[in-house]
Amino acid sequence: GLVQNEKGEYLFIFRNNHLDLPKGHQEEGENLEVTAVREVEEETGLKDITLGEKLGVTYHTYKREGKRELKATHWYKMSSKSTEALTPQEEEGIERVEWLSEEYLSEHKKEIYASLYHFLRKHLKI
C-alpha cells in the first residue's frame, strides 16, 4: 500500500538494500482490500489504517524454489493518523520502516526498484 501520514510523508520499508512499499500475498478467503491493509500492518506494525482508492496493478518477477515467478501487486492508497512507533517484520527480511518525504524519495531514487519508481512517479511528485 501507498500509505500517507498527516505530514504528507509516505510509509516505506527497507529490505534487500532497497526502499519498497509494504505488500504481500493474499490469503485464502481474503479480498484484495483486506490483504492490502493486513500486509501493511504485519510488515510495519502500523495501526489505524484507512483504505482509499485502488491505484493500479504492477508486475514483477522473483525466484521461488529455483523458478521464476510472476507476481501481480494490487496497489491501494491508504492513510494513517497513527504516531506510534513502527516495527519492521524482521522475519520477512525488513530491516527498518520509515516515513519518507517526496523530496527524500527524489534524492534516493537509486534505492528504489525501477518498476516501483515508475509506479511512484505516476502518484507522487518525485
Where are these regions (language model features)?
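Charged phosphate-binding loop/patch that engages nucleotide di/tri-phosphates or the phosphate backbone
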Residues: 111-126
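Phenylalanine-focused residue identity feature
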Residues: 12-14, 104, 119
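A short local loop/turn or secondary-structure capping micro-motif enriched for an aromatic residue
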Residues: 19-22, 29, 116-117
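Unchanged
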Residues: 26-113
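N-terminal strand-loop-strand
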Residues: 1-22
